[in-house]
Amino acid sequence: MIGPKGARVMIVGDVPNDADFQKGEPFIGGGGYELSKMLQEAGTFREEVLMRYVVMEEGWGSVEELVALKKKDVTGEHVLYRGKHVLPCVVEMVEELKAAIEEERPTVVVPVGNLALWALTGEWSVRNWRSSLMESTLVPGQKVIPTLPPLAVIVQWGMRPIVIHDLKRVVRESQWREIKRVDYSFVIRPDYPTAIEYLAKLI
């Protein structure tokens, strides 16, 4: 993990690539370079952010090697942990992530991958949960805002403004620790006067 003590934001990826290990630093290469630029456009700098992965050791190439995503992939080696069948080493990795968060106490943790999102919240799919204000189930009280992996932006450039939007929310939310959820209330089947009143407010 790299980044300053007392950082308000921690970004957590899934699995390091070869370039990360060669440089000894997370989020290196094209995706990492783009992440640095997007952070700056969102109002912060790479040097102000903690960065790490769930997986912190060499030898693992993908999430599928660690987590049985389909029933047919489950073997005798897998253990049930946080609702997923995983290799035993994943349990250790997630506990190490928990310890790192408890030690550093960032205001917001940003998972940028499905494994990271699951480790922090028990949910899967950053595409479904991106930009959501969530509370960690791994570290209760910890604020979590997922976004897409940097490599997803390289592959699909149209995702770039979306990730920057998410990171801007991260920067805003990093100003306070409380998880301030919006209390949405909906008016279902309003009568005519109520509908006219609401429409007048929109004009």
Range-by-range predicted roles:
Residues 168-203:
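N-terminal accessory regions of nucleic-acid-interacting proteins
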